[in-house]
């Protein structure tokens, strides 16, 4: 089941249009792509196409007349039960009931591959996400980034793309020096030295604790080094420790990366200098005001690439974050040959989007090969009370603390209950509440209820794997559940192509609700109705498989018992 029903219907509408034109029922015109969507109101079929509303001016005919001609010439298909023209010119399609119920067997046959598609055609997509500065523990903002990126990677893989997950370690910027100075101060203080804490240093107990641990493990060896050398060494040691902690936290969130790419590699390999030279040769680099600038007609203002010592009042030139972005784009799209590079960034980086795309274009690359997702902030709440956080001040809740309090499943699910471009609240109390108000509990409970139902059937002597006559599935709640199950491939396609993984949580909640309605309306195990029971057990198994598949794509466990 790797082909979307929606696409097959669009093809039928297109063929109907072509046949009508050949028979001169419609004039010749060039049609835009046929759009097929799900009607908002029940009773308007399973699918609808508004294409005729777009064709009126081209055909010089009313949309309804165009729709009638297309509907009359659409070829028959086993999955189409009824075609009708409605309203001002919609073509409504109702799926054939026999074909619909037969899909229960197809879903069970597909098994864990149900929902997989081939729309990616094996193209190489890289998703780079989290990539938090290695100067402190991950917070809930980083957790949202992590959940968005990992779920998107799951969806892209299911859609048929070859996917690589990457974490970009920012270990070449000025923040690394500030980090090293902060650690040095706390390290020296733990050894009894009166060392002032840097004005722009990183606050927080974790810096104090790191300094103490390094003092315990290494004694005063860093005090014997020249201060600059000690700061540099402690900065590297601090980054190593933070990255180890980040890896542990992300593993607890069931996230693993294929690659950990260090920013410093861009400079040590000479790639930054080479990319800068390419831009210079093409006329995109100018030098003024003691700095090196990138200039491009698509940008409202030039972007600084390198600041000189006179500007930053430090002993060496200092590349900006944007400088690294230039070389990094070349590394991804050319040296490693990804067809598309997807970045997951916080919305505070919105100003960098145009610069990165302009730099890619200036290097001779198609900027459309770069996709940048911008996600909004998360407000951490406990009921109605907001929990404040600030990495610099040290007053923040870490991802580790969040994991310890609510666990990985509520984090992964609830951080995807809003679109990425919407600011969202994460309620710590709701995340642990065992009620229908908690969306992850509601969905997981549906899976556990199905599993319990199947165990009960086995206890009653039923072979739940036995085939049944699915044509007996005629109750509206049964048919509604089949229809909802068959939406999964479309949700995968929509989420993957629009880079919108939140559709998956919406679908999971909807599927759970439709199953609960089926469970309420239809007695599954009825000894006096053996054939009906076998058919409903098949549908129940298909629902469990689909719910488990959805939760797996979300990176959330599908419990057998709750």
Regions found by a protein language model. Give the residues of each.
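Non-catalytic interaction-recognition regions
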Residues: 1-102, 109-112, 116-562
